[in-house]
């Protein structure tokens, strides 16, 4: 799990587009904290700190602490809006995290031991079907990533979620099938040779029929 961090917030009394624009002009960003059966809180946060956190990676999988007038609130960033043209952050939604909060998150997939995969050593290409996998898990136990071991994979082999060792309490949201994470595909040259070989065999068969 990524290292938690703290942001200092101020309560926001006014809401709406006009108020939000004024907040952003003052170097801050509007945000809201919701969930855990409590009323939503409208707040403002320092723009620079939030922007850096968003672009540092792992923003939506790291539990943070928001200090609101001395009250420490555990939260998980759930969504944020970026300006479509200039790319700056415009708004953030935070989920309030309680002791027993279970969340749904997208967790990145990391691949290891590609040098131990015969198919890749022979020139095969790792075709990544899912760069992230959606899981439900305790908010205080979100993994930074899951590891997929490629050891022993040959050309044509696939890795399914059932083959991935998951931390305790981490459950895929897709439960009705053993979905594919990645496959090892044949290199282009090998595919061409296979196609040519098939055509030659077909030609020989036709000659034999005559």
UniProtKB/Swiss-Prot annotation:
<dbReference type="InterPro" id="IPR001021">
    <property type="entry name" value="Ribosomal_bL25_long"/>
</dbReference>
<dbReference type="GO" id="GO:0008097">
    <property type="term" value="F:5S rRNA binding"/>
</dbReference>
<dbReference type="InterPro" id="IPR029751">
    <property type="entry name" value="Ribosomal_L25_dom"/>
</dbReference>
<keyword id="KW-0694">RNA-binding</keyword>
<comment type="similarity">
    <text>Belongs to the bacterial ribosomal protein bL25 family. CTC subfamily.</text>
</comment>
<dbReference type="InterPro" id="IPR011035">
    <property type="entry name" value="Ribosomal_bL25/Gln-tRNA_synth"/>
</dbReference>
<dbReference type="InterPro" id="IPR020930">
    <property type="entry name" value="Ribosomal_uL5_bac-type"/>
</dbReference>
<feature type="compositionally biased region" description="Acidic residues">
    <location>
        <begin position="196"/>
        <end position="210"/>
    </location>
</feature>
<keyword id="KW-0689">Ribosomal protein</keyword>
<dbReference type="GO" id="GO:0003735">
    <property type="term" value="F:structural constituent of ribosome"/>
</dbReference>
<comment type="subunit">
    <text>Part of the 50S ribosomal subunit; part of the 5S rRNA/L5/L18/L25 subcomplex. Contacts the 5S rRNA. Binds to the 5S rRNA independently of L5 and L18.</text>
</comment>
<dbReference type="InterPro" id="IPR037121">
    <property type="entry name" value="Ribosomal_bL25_C"/>
</dbReference>
<dbReference type="GO" id="GO:0006412">
    <property type="term" value="P:translation"/>
</dbReference>
<dbReference type="Pfam" id="PF14693">
    <property type="entry name" value="Ribosomal_TL5_C"/>
</dbReference>
<keyword id="KW-0687">Ribonucleoprotein</keyword>
<feature type="region of interest" description="Disordered">
    <location>
        <begin position="190"/>
        <end position="210"/>
    </location>
</feature>
<dbReference type="InterPro" id="IPR020056">
    <property type="entry name" value="Rbsml_bL25/Gln-tRNA_synth_N"/>
</dbReference>
<keyword id="KW-0699">rRNA-binding</keyword>
<dbReference type="GO" id="GO:0022625">
    <property type="term" value="C:cytosolic large ribosomal subunit"/>
</dbReference>
<dbReference type="InterPro" id="IPR020057">
    <property type="entry name" value="Ribosomal_bL25_b-dom"/>
</dbReference>
<comment type="function">
    <text>This is one of the proteins that binds to the 5S RNA in the ribosome where it forms part of the central protuberance.</text>
</comment>
<dbReference type="Pfam" id="PF01386">
    <property type="entry name" value="Ribosomal_L25p"/>
</dbReference>
<protein>
    <recommendedName>
        <fullName>Large ribosomal subunit protein bL25</fullName>
    </recommendedName>
</protein>
């Amino acid at each position: 799990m990524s290292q938690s961090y703290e942001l200092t917030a101020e309560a926001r009394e006014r809401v709406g587009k006009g108020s939000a624009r004024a907040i952003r002009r003052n170097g801050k960003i509007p945000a809201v904290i919701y969930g855990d059966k409590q009323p939503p809180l409208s707040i403002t946060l320092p723009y620079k700190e939030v922007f850096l956190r968003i672009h540092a990676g792992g923003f939506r999988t790291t539990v943070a602490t928001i200090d609101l007038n001395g009250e420490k609130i555990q939260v998980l960033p759930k969504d944020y809006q970026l300006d479509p043209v200039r790319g700056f952050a415009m708004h953030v939604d935070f989920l309030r995290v309680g002791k027993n909060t279970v969340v749904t998150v997208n967790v990145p997939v990391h691949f290891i031991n590609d040098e131990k995969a015969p198919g890749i050593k022979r020139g095969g290409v790792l075709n990544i079907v899912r760069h992230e996998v959606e899981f439900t898990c305790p908010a205080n136990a979100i993994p930074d990533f899951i590891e997929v071991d490629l050891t022993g994979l040959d050309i044509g082999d696939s890795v399914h979620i059932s083959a991935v060792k998951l931390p305790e309490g981490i459950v895929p949201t897709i439960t009705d099938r053993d979905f594919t994470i990645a496959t090892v595909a044949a290199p282009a040259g090998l595919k061409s040779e296979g196609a040519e070989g098939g055509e030659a065999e077909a030609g020989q068969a036709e000659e034999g029929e005559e």
